[in-house]
Amino acid sequence: MLRTSPAGSLRAEHTAQVVTLTGWVDRRRDHGGVAFIDLRDASGIAQVVIRDEAVAHPLRNEFVLQVTGEVSRRPAGNENPNLPTGEIEVVASDVVVLNSAAALPFQVSTALADTEAIGEEVRLKYRYLDLRRPAPARAIRLRAKANQAARRVLDAEEFVEIETPTLTRSTPEGARDFLVPARLAPGSWYALPQSPQLFKQLLMVAGMERYYQIARCYRDEDFRADRQPEFTQLDVEMSFVEQDDVIALAEKVLVALWELIGFTIPTPIPRMTFDDAMRLYGTDKPDLRFGNPIVELTSYFADTPFRVFQSEYVGAVVMAGGASLPRRQFDAWQEWAKQRGARGLAYVTFPEDGSDLGGPVAKNLSDAERAGLREATGAAPGDAVFFAAGATTPSRALLGAARQEIAKRTGLIDSADQEGAWAFVWVVDAPLFKPTGDAADDGDVALGHSAWTAVHHAFTSPTPEWIDTFEQDPGSALSNAYDIVCNGNEIGGGSIRIHRRDVQERVFQVMGIDAAEAQEKFGFLLDAFSYGAPPHGGIAFGWDRILALLTGSESIREVIAFPKSGGGYDPLTQAPAPITAEQRRESGVDAVPDDETAPQA
């Protein structure tokens, strides 16, 4: 080794020892011909004293040094209580420059790095420098600890870590595949996996019983904020289990992860049906750090003279203290709603003095409606109430978004104490199918050719109550699925899987996939189900999202070592990039397959 001690490990008890340190010049200070170097390595910082001006003169930030010297106590009054090594310094007897550093595109020093505003494109272009900064480095190191914590839990539960293929065939899974040309089979292509879903089910058929993998996944999606074309999930599958078994195991993993940041998750985590989540919070990812649920007023306005409220659905959400907002802020709320595809956001105000309702909607309501509205909505004097009316799903979604925005603007989230800083909930009993048009609206690729496609994926089992009848009413059938939500973020999702060939074929039929197409695209899975497939289920955790929450990061890019920027571009390597004519020829990108011999995509 080029060093005897990590820089951050030195303490007062090491005084008088001669050590050799290696690391980067974090910063330097000069006092009367003596240079003080903060030497940084992965363990921390130690102050190095260089008394030879000729040696110290050329040293600049981010030079890589090897320093040999004696550990000494700092003079009284010069200790640094903010550093674990703040009681000592190393008086250098020998300094070797292992490498110099060019002028930096941004500050890396721990003293400056977290306060300097740096553009994301520059950070990603020089990611190897960015990761020297304290906050990015901490995020990546915590990710490693999270991997270890999950493995400890799963190893203790006798799970087997198995790697599944990353070169496979293209199968419809809800997004576009990244395709890889097969050089030895011109005109044919591999696909990178969107998830290990089919392989982990095959592992259950194979008798592995308990599988997990920290899996790399790939989806060729249109640009969405805070999405990555390649991402990581903790993938888990179990045989001979029911929903409660998978949830109990998943909670053990979550408890271990949040213990890394000193928080104990109360278990069992509460559960909420999909219908209740949509009715009360307008989303299947409710943020339960605060209350203020949506109030349904459809029945209340059943006989209303106000034409706007003569709708399929009328709902409201309260903004505490909102009555005092100036008119321009209410106008800004209208623009906020229009940006979300709504025509606006109707509102009334309840004055502090108890006088008659304010706001443009009030004059359109009957006397009885005005008189009972405060009680119906739960509003107090001084509050404002926002309304949405129209089709149920988009109206609830608008109110759910308004509820979240109200919480941000009024400090409901920021005021949560440590115990309330994290709110977990399982959302269960989601629909099995959704209209194909809804998938397109969500930016997903609908699987199949009928009016219905899968909400989760095509391999999710119906609930026991629906397993024999789901074809009769696809829009009402429920899935044996469960999503885990933390602070309004979906951080994992799973289901009990279909393990019978006949049930899987019936699900395909609802989705417009006939027997021939099912055999062509999923024959390997259907055939496996014919050989004694056990009942099984599992869950996949969104690893990047979980790590973003654990580290307090605004974006998942902060917890990925080398992330892509918007549109899947990598400023560091400038990928994606054109290939040469020779590469095109060798890879067979332009080859046209022989229809008689080529495998069907």
UniProtKB/Swiss-Prot annotation:
GO cellular component: cytoplasm
Organism of provenance: Beutenbergia cavernae (strain ATCC BAA-8 / DSM 12333 / CCUG 43141 / JCM 11478 / NBRC 16432 / NCIMB 13614 / HKI 0122)
Membrane-crossing segments per the record: none
SUPFAM superfamilies documented for this protein: Class II aaRS and biotin synthetases, GAD domain-like, Nucleic acid-binding proteins
GO terms of biological process kind: aspartyl-tRNA aminoacylation
Binding site for ATP: R219, D220, E221, Q228, E490, G542, W543, D544, R545
Descriptive protein name: Aspartate--tRNA(Asp/Asn) ligase
EC number of this enzyme: 6.1.1.23
